[in-house]
Structures are given as C-alpha cells and as structure tokens.
Swiss-Prot record:
Gene3D superfamilies: Classic Zinc Finger (3.30.160.60). Interacts with CHD8. Forms a complex with HCFC1 and ZNF143. A zinc finger (C2H2-type) spans 237-261, 267-291, 297-321, 327-351, 357-381, 387-411, 417-440. The lineage of its organism: Eukaryota, Metazoa, Chordata, Craniata, Vertebrata. PROSITE patterns: ZINC_FINGER_C2H2_1, ZINC_FINGER_C2H2_2. This is Zinc finger protein 143. GO terms for cellular component: nucleus.
C-alpha cells in the first residue's frame, strides 16, 4: 500500500539556500484528499518533485524535476538556471527489514522541549489506519504523523502537518538539512494563513469539509523506513551549545530547541501593527487567531459550550471533564499530578525553591517561579492594564488575563467551575475550592483555564442572583416605582446580618478576616447613600421575638437613625412594616415565597427589608465581600 496524491491547480514556490550560490527554486505541490493505490505504479502522480543535488561547493540544493522526463543519474552533472554546474546526489535511505514503523500505544517519544510524550492512535476514516500515528505533544496537542509503508518509485513522501512541521523527513544518518526543514515549515505556515483553508478538528488542513495535507515528493533510491534508533527510542541529535547537551530524536526537534539558545523567531505575524514573532509555525497560527477571534475547537461534552483557539487548549480543557492528570511530580513522596507538563514544571520549583524570573525594577528584588506571575508583577510597576472588558458600558481593565477571565463571568452569568464530587457549579474557582475543602475535605488545588470562551447556558435568562436576593419598591404613589435587588451576606453560626449591599454596585464594604472577627456581635451594612453603618446588637435583641430598635452608628462613630430589628418570622415583619409604613418614603418587601426575615433598617427615612436564603459559611462571606470591594455584585450561590 502507498500514499497517492492528486495535484491541485495552484502550486506554491519557495526557495532553499544553496551554499554560496543563489537560492534554488523548489515547487511544493498542495495535494487534495489522499487516496490509496496498490502495485508498483503510483496513481495520479502528476506534478513536479524535488531532486537533491550537490553544488560545486559541496552544499546540497533541491531542484525541480519531473519524473516523467526520466531519472537523474547519481553523479550526473546538470546545468542550473544561473548557468552554474551541479552534481546530482540521491539521498540514501536505509533498507527496511520488513514492516514499516509501528509505534506502540504508550511509547515514549522525545519532544522539542526535552520532555517526554506518549504515542496514542486516533481513528481517521479516510486514511489507512496503519499509516497514521498520533503523538500527544506536551501542551496537549495531538499531532498526526504519517509513515508511508512503502514508496516504490522510489520516492519518499514528506507530509507537512497542520501545525507547520514536517513528518517523515529524517531517516538514518542521511537527514535533510535543518535549514531546509525550516524553509518548508515557513512556507506551510504562510499557506495556512494566507489561504482560504480552515483547520478541522482532526488537526489537518481542510477545505469544504475535505481533509487535505501538503506533501512534497523527493526522489530517492529506497523505501521509507524508520531507523532502529527511533524504534528503540534512542536520541540521535544532540544540542552542541555549551552547558546544554540535550538529545532529540529528530533534527527538526533539535532545530526548534536551538532557537531557545539563539532567540530565533522566524515566524512573523503579518497582521497590521502586530509584528510578533514565534519559534514555530504552529505558534504563529495559534497567535493569528487572536486577531481573527476564531475559536474552532469546541468542547463536545454535554452542557459545555466552551471554545478554544487551539486543539491543545481544548484537550487540556477536556481533562477537566475526565479528571485525567497524566503529568506526575517526580519528587519522591509528593504524588501530585497535573493536566499539563508546564504546570508540573512550575510545581516542581516549589520543591527546589527555584525562582528563575527576577524583577529588574530598582529596589524590588522579587523573584518568581513562573513567567506568568513575573509578567503580572511587572505591570504593578508599569501601571499597565492591557486586559479590557469588552462588555458595553463596563470598560474595566486588568493587569492579568486571569482577572479579566474571572470578571467576565459576572456579565455572562456562567458557572464554569463544577465540583467533581457532587456536581455543584460556581462562578469563581476560589468558591469551588472552598466548597471542596469544607464539604468534601478535598484540598487538591484546582487548575484554572486561561483560554476559555463562555456563553450563558440556555434558558438561564436574566435570573442572575438567587437565594439571598429581595426586591423592594418605594411607597410613592403613581408609576414612578423603583425596583432594586439587594444581595446580602450573613455570618455563619449567627442569626444577625453582617453586610448589606445593593446590586447597582455603588455601595462597597472593605472586610477582611480580622475585620470579621473584630465585628463580633455587630451588624455592618451600607446604606443607599453609600454610608457604612455598624449596628451594635445583643443576643437578646436578635434572638427574642418581636420588633426592636437600636441606634445606628456611622463609620465616623456618630449615632444616627434607629434600626428596627424584626424577629425571624414573616408575621412579625408584616406587623413591623405596617407600623413603619406611615413614615415618608417607606419601602415594602415584595416576595414570591415565605422566607425568614432578619433585618429591617431605616436610612434617611428609607426602610430596607432583608430576606435570607441559605446561610453561607464565614469564608464565603469574606470572599463575597472581597469581590464587592472590587466592584462586583455577586450572589450567595455563585
């Protein structure tokens, strides 16, 4: 069996350097959906292939050659376009001992950053399953490597994958020059961005829902095989930079690794005003989606509507559903595991104490274990807040993406964090972590998604705050009735109200663990004019039935209006509200169900009734108050 190709009408041109001579033109054929043919003749093999030739200075170049015109003889002298002479040299490929490469499920392979990934196979209906290999890269991306079983002519088919890398290029001691690989990848990346193709969920380039690949045909003398060094996992390519010495299984991975030493970023974003550059073609393609807004990778999990820019981000997200944590901490006695190797790498620094990222601000001297934390810290010095909320009328800015990400759910009302024990959902990851600790005694840290797109769950509508919200209306006659929702926070174990906040976000309270402990038996609330008020209470006042009045104390310590404390039953509240209903601008409770009422307060003649839902824990009260201080308006159930 062999892999055939059908030529498209268009052909792309690129150049490869040829030593000191001018660059040689090479034709790359963008091929449509692959087909399979039997026998010694390759079906539908039209078009121009690449021929390796040795130039006069000893370097290797690649020239156009049509196989129909006959074969070039090894050592033959040919005339190039610039008039110079070149010598034909066939790239030798070792003979196969039989079957083609078959990487077993779970087999370890070395990736470009030096870490180990494992092979796994995925189903592709339109391809010969024995010739497709799936490699899960470190960031979660699944790369599909094609290994041709046999190429009779003898040609070697080199497939440029959707991530811009070249598969099937390196065999034995005779490898294609790394500069050639780089040129091929740059061309593939440019075609991927400039062309009209989309990227399918399979990770291959597709158009009109047909899977496509870019292929190059190189003239050779033998069948495509894989050297035994690769089958045994031996690493044949060593980094020659001083103090490094890392080994890689392919010249391509070594080439990419060397860019970490040289700082070379050959893939430049051509979007107007951007100018960012990347070390790999896949990095450029992923970045380009930040300009287009494209998020083609959607989670297929039921009731999950998240989308992602890369397949790697999607696969990392899927692990939040499956619970898979394939990257284990190697430190003896730790036992922690993680969804990505990068998170594991940062975690390992908690064992070693390594903090490689130092702040260069004079007088600062702080160091960080992760680049993300370092960059976020630097913005404290610069005052930069590059992340802006795009919701109309909001315009809030943040120093780090995670803060914008967390803020975004305030507008969408999504609850993306779910408990893997009981299924409860939460808006904030900190609330989920608190729930897991208190309800399930689970102290395992929760990893946050930083590249997510949220949509409100269907049918949720505008019913945002639940549990602890009430609606009150002014007692003014006519149609000028103002309706406001009030979110409340209670202290666990006590029946009194701790904080009162209106939903419009104009009222703020600064509360901490120490503040909460210092309050003791007091009631803290914020009135409608924004004045914080502390109400001293007594157990007898709160616990006894009936209506009681206490003097409000403002933040400045001056005594103010009277606050009516109502016993926790609806009848008592109705009696109290009836008495106070004769006061000007009184407010009456509007509720659809009977719930305990804890507090009735007056502020400048306005009465406020608070109806409680479920009482949260003390930690949740502190967390909600902290969010309110940041300008958010949470409910108790988020």
């Amino acid at each position: 069996m062999l892999l055939a190709q059908i030529n498209r009408d268009s052909q792309g041109m690129t150049e490869f350097p040829g030593g000191g001579m001018e660059a040689q033109h090479v034709t790359l054929c963008l091929t449509e959906a692959v087909t399979v043919a039997d026998g010694d003749n390759l079906e539908n093999m039209e078009g121009v292939s690449l021929q390796a030739v040795t130039l006069a200075d000893g370097s290797t170049a690649y020239i156009q050659h049509n196989s129909k015109d006959g074969r070039l003889i090894d050592g033959q002298v040919i005339q190039l376009e610039d008039g110079s002479a070149a010598y034909v040299q066939h790239v030798p490929i070792p003979k196969s001992t039989g079957d083609s490469l078959r990487l077993e499920d779970g087999q370890a392979v070395q990736l470009e950053d030096g870490t180990t990934a494992f092979i796994h196979h995925t189903s592709k209906d339109s391809y010969d399953q024995s010739s497709l290999q799936a490699v899960q890269l470190e960031d979660g991306t699944t790369a599909y490597i094609h290994h041709a079983v046999q190429v009779p002519q003898p040609d070697t088919i080199l497939a440029i994958q959707a991530d811009g890398t070249v598969a099937g290029l390196h065999t034995g001691d005779a490898t294609i020059d790394p500069d050639t690989i780089s040129a091929l990848e740059q061309y593939a990346a440019k075609v991927s961005i400039d062309g009209s193709e989309g990227v399918t969920s399979t990770g291959l380039i597709g158009e009109n829902e047909q899977e496509k690949k870019m292929q190059i045909v190189l003239q050779g003398h033998a069948t495509r095989v894989t050297p035994k060094s690769q089958q045994s996992g031996e690493k044949a390519f060593r980094c020659k930079y001083d103090g490094c010495g890392k080994l890689y299984t392919t010249a391509h991975h070594l080439k990419v690794h060397e860019r970490s030493h040289t700082g070379d970023r050959p893939y430049q974003c051509e979007h107007s005003g951007c100018g960012k550059a990347f070390a790999t073609g896949y990095g450029l393609k992923s970045h380009f989606r930040t300009h287009t807004g494209e998020k083609p990778y959607r989670c297929s999990e039921d009731n999950c509507t998240k989308s992602f820019k890369t397949s790697g981000d999607l696969q990392k997200h899927i692990r939040t559903h499956t619970g898979e944590r394939p990257f284990k901490c190697p430190i003896e006695g730790c036992g922690r595991s993680f969804t990505t190797s990068n998170i594991r790498k940062v975690h390992i620094r908690t064992h070693t104490g390594e903090r490689p990222y130092y702040c260069t601000e004079p007088g600062c001297g702080r160091a960080f274990a992760s680049a993300t934390n370092y960059k976020n810290h630097v913005r404290i010095h610069t005052g930069e807040k590059p992340y802006v909320c795009t919701v109309p009328g909001c315009d809030k800015r943040f120093t780090e993406y995670s803060s914008l990400y967390k803020h975004h759910v305030v507008h969408t009302h999504s609850k993306p964090y779910n408990c893997n024990h009981c299924g409860k959902t939460y808006k904030q990851i900190s609330t989920l972590a608190m729930h897991k600790r208190t309800a399930h005694n689970d102290t395992e840290p929760i990893e946050e998604e930083q590249e997510a797109f949220f949509e409100p769950p269907p049918g949720q509508g505008d019913d945002v705050l639940k549990g602890s919200q009430i609606t009150y209306v002014t007692g003014v006659e006519g149609e000028d009735i103002v309706s406001t929702q009030v979110a409340t926070v209670t202290q666990s174990g006590l029946s009194q109200q701790v904080t009162l906040i209106s939903q419009d976000g104009t009222q703020h309270v600064n509360i901490s663990q120490a503040d909460m402990q210092a309050i003791g038996n007091t009631i803290t609330m914020v009135t409608q004019d924004g004045t914080p008020i502390t109400v001293p209470t007594h157990d007898a006042v709160i616990s006894s039935a009936g209506t009681h009045s206490v003097a409000m104390v403002t933040a400045e310590g001056t005594e103010g209006q009277q606050v009516a404390i109502v016993a926790q039953d609806l009848a008592a509240f109705h009696a109290a509200s009836s008495e106070m209903g004769h006061q000007p601008h009184s407010h009456h409770l509007v509720t659809t169900e009977t719930r305990p009422l804890t507090l009735v307060a007056t502020s400048n003649g306005t009465q406020i009734a608070v109806q409680l839902g479920e009482q949260p824990s003390l930690e949740e009260a502190i967390r909600i108050a902290s969010r309110i201080q940041q300008g958010e308006t949470p409910g108790l159930d988020d």
